[in-house]
């Protein structure tokens, strides 16, 4: 992916209201690939004072959104599955990497 096209995706994430609200930043993008990061803050706590699964899932979904749409065609998720292993530490930088493994026109 050329530099100009990458810049378009960085700008899209910077301007996306939800990504801004969550503090999600695009770190790298290529065709079928994206890396996003987000700092875990107190505002992302669940009622047990651990990271809310929805906050973590939002980071994952953002990386997926960018990688799957990096071919200039709108793509959507039909299904996503997450296994949460253990909660992150407060203030830690969370990272989501999305790699496309197959692209077809069929569902």
Which residues fall in each region the model found?
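Terminal targeting signals and extreme-terminal segments of soluble enzymes
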Residues: 1-107
């Amino acid at each position: 992916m050329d530099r100009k096209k990458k810049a378009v995706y960085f700008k899209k994430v910077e301007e996306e209201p939800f990504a801004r609200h969550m503090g999600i930043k695009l770190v790298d993008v290529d065709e079928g690939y994206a890396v996003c990061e987000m700092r875990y803050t107190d505002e992302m706590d669940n009622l047990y004072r651990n990271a809310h699964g929805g906050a973590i899932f939002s980071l994952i979904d953002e990386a997926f959104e960018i990688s799957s749409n990096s071919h200039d065609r709108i793509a959507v998720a039909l299904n996503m599955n997450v296994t949460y292993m253990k909660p992150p530490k407060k203030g830690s930088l969370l990272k989501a990497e999305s790699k496309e493994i197959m692209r077809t026109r069929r569902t």
